[in-house]
Amino acid sequence: MTQLAQQEKKQTYNFNKLQKRLRRNVGNAIADFGMIEDGDKVMVCLSGGKDSYTLLDILLNLQQSAPIKFDIVAVNLDQKQPGFPEHVLPEYLESIGVDYKIVQENTYGIVKEKIPEGKTTCSLCSRLRRGILYRTATELGATKIALGHHRDDMLATLFLNMFYGGKMKSMPPKLISDDGKQIVIRPLAYCKEKDIEKYAIAKKFPIIPCNLCGSQPNLQRQVVKEMLNTWDRQYPGRLETMFSAMQNITLSHMCDPKLFDFKGIKHGQLIDGIEGDTAFDEERITPMQFEDEDQTDFSNNEMINFKEVN
C-alpha cells in the first residue's frame, strides 16, 4: 500500500469515527430530552455556519435509521445583509435533496436604522430573527424548531450569566416559547465545537462567513469563550467536567430559597436524597477522567437505537 493510500485510509477511518461520535451524541441528546417524537416535522434553522450545517447533516443521517418517523425542512432567513451570497444555500440544499424555504426579510435595514453605528446589533437582530422563525414554523406546520447551539455555547452562556447577570442559567436543550406555541430544541447539546469544526472541514460545507453585518463582536461572550479555550488547553477534560456538573445539581447545597425549603429544616428531620453537611470535613473530590474522547458521553439514558448509515 502506497503512502498516499495509507493516508487516505487513515483519513476515512478518522472521519467515520468522528461521524459516529457526533451521531451518538446527537442521538443521546434527542433521547434524554425527548427532542424529537414520532410524526414530528423538524424545522432546522440554517445560517450557513459550521454548526447549522452539521446539525442538518447529522439529523438527515439519523432520519434514515431512526425507529421513529419525522420530517425535516431547512429554513434560512435572508436578512438582506450587503454581500450575502444568496445562491449558496439554495444550491447546497437542492444538491442534497432536502426540503427547504428561504425567508427574505430586511431585518438588516431595520437594525441599521435603530442601532447607532458601531454598537452591537446582536440583541435586536436576535429578537427580530426569533419572531420571523416562529412565524415561519407555524406557516410550515413545524412541530419542532432545531437550533445549532452546541455544548461549548451552553457552557459559555452559563459563565456569561454568572459573570455578568448574577444567575446560574445556561441555554436549555429544549424549551417552549413564551406563548406556548413553539418548542425549540438543540440536538447538538452534547457535541463539542472542536468535533463540529473537524466535521465541517471534512464535509466541505459551503460556509458563509458571519462577519457580514459589520456589528461589533459580543465582547463579553468572546472573553468567556477565550477563557474556556484556555482552560481546555491547560487542563484537558475540564470542559467535560463542567458540563457534567450542569447535569448534577444539588439544590440543598446552593443558596436559592425558592428552590429549596431552608426555613423548613427542623431538628431531628431526616430528608431522603439530601446530602449531608461537609462544613467540618475536608471534602475529597476525585477528578473525573475523560482520557478517551470517544468515551465522552453525557447521556443519562440509552440512546435511541439508530442503525449505522454510511
Swiss-Prot record:
Chain location of the short sequence motif PP-loop motif per the record: 47-52
Note describing how the cofactor binds: Binds 1 [4Fe-4S] cluster per subunit. The cluster is chelated by three Cys residues, the fourth Fe has a free coordination site that may bind a sulfur atom transferred from the persulfide of IscS.
Binding-site list for [4Fe-4S] cluster: 122, 125, 213
Alphabetized InterPro entries for the sequence: Rossmann-like_a/b/a_fold, TilS/TtcA_N, tRNA_Cyd_32_2_STrfase, tRNA_thiolation_TtcA_Ctu1
Subcellular location: Cytoplasm
This protein's record includes keyword Disulfide bond: no
EC number: 2.8.1.-
Signal peptide segment: none
Family: Belongs to the TtcA family.
Additional facts recorded: The thiolation reaction likely consists of two steps: a first activation step by ATP to form an adenylated intermediate of the target base of tRNA, and a second nucleophilic substitution step of the sulfur (S) atom supplied by the hydrosulfide attached to the Fe-S cluster.
Protein name, per record: tRNA-cytidine(32) 2-sulfurtransferase
Species annotation: Haemophilus influenzae (strain PittEE)
